Amino acid sequence: AGFAGDDAPRAVFPSIVGRPRHAGVMVGMGQKDAYVGDEAQSKRGILTLKYPIEHGIVNNWDDMEKIWHHTFYNELRVAPEERPVLLTEAPLNPKANREKMTQIMFETFNAPAMYVAIQAVLSLYASGRTTGIVLDSGDGVSHTVPIYEGYALPHAILRLDLAGADLTEYMVKILTERGYSFTTTAEKEIVRDMKEKLAYLALDFEQELETTTTGSAVEKNYELPDGQVITIGAERFRCPEVLYQPSLIGMEAAGIHETTYNSIMKCDVDIRKDLYGNIVLSGGSTMFPGIADRMSKEIQALAPSSMKIKVVAPPERKYSVWIGGSILASLSTFQQ
């Protein structure tokens, strides 16, 4: 969350609401009935955590309201009734959801005006384009969204329920095979950090595996919060490989490359060339080093041989949805 015209968000926190498991034991401690974001994360030992956004879609409006309240009053410290609000939604978000979102903004927060934009479209704006296909992959869901002249093409949008959370789960699994156990939510956070700091995508998975068995060039050390140091090797590229081979976690789905290709093939034949030449990556789960080269290679194998393919991975892609929103909301045409 942040303000239009800024080049980075003012507040970044997980969409989590935590409620105390037990009624207040310590009287007068001023225990809140709910904690949001980082505070919920840090007090998770005494809380029951809930995630109101599942696979990119809001499914718990009371908790979502808590998150918005926290955003306005604690993070941004603005009165929502004084400023127009731009919210984002997942592609293919049900109409009822958008209506509910609008209702809460106007009735609960008294916003003077609001607009709901599709996340992937904002990412494309942030990259300075109005035509292209965006692969947006976050924690709960991935989407491929073809956009032509600023408009998303709903019939060609594809959703893949495979994203960051699944990669973290898989990392936990393959580390368990090595004898390291991570079970609690706190420990899973450690694995997520390990994934974000050390994982990368191999250009050629099989070849990378062979190289790893002979040498130790891939091995890296990671220090756990208690000071213990663990060494991870092939796990570094085995983990994000799931994006290209969902079968590794037993999912019968097309990988992100194939989903992108399928999405392009659902579009009019005349615009495919523009889409192949503008494949834009967005979201935290596209932050792995090597992802753009690998994507390029995989799409080239699927596309017609003469096709010019360009995969764009902007350095700020973790927040490009937000940045696109900041750009859009500061346009004078938008404010009217």
UniProtKB/Swiss-Prot annotation:
Q: What is its EC number?
A: 3.6.4.-
Q: Which PROSITE patterns match?
A: ACTINS_1 (PS00406), ACTINS_ACT_LIKE (PS01132)
Question: What family classification does the UniProt entry report for this protein?
Answer: Belongs to the actin family.
Name of the protein in question: Actin-46
Report one GO cellular component. Answer: cytosol
Species in which this protein is naturally found:
Solanum tuberosum (Potato)
Cellular location(s): Cytoplasm, Cytoskeleton
Q: Which UniProt keywords apply?
A: ATP-binding, Cytoplasm, Cytoskeleton, Hydrolase, Nucleotide-binding
Question: Which InterPro entries does the UniProt entry name for this protein?
Answer: Actin (IPR004000), Actin/actin-like_CS (IPR020902), Actin_CS (IPR004001), ATPase_NBD (IPR043129)
What does the entry give for GO biological process? cell division
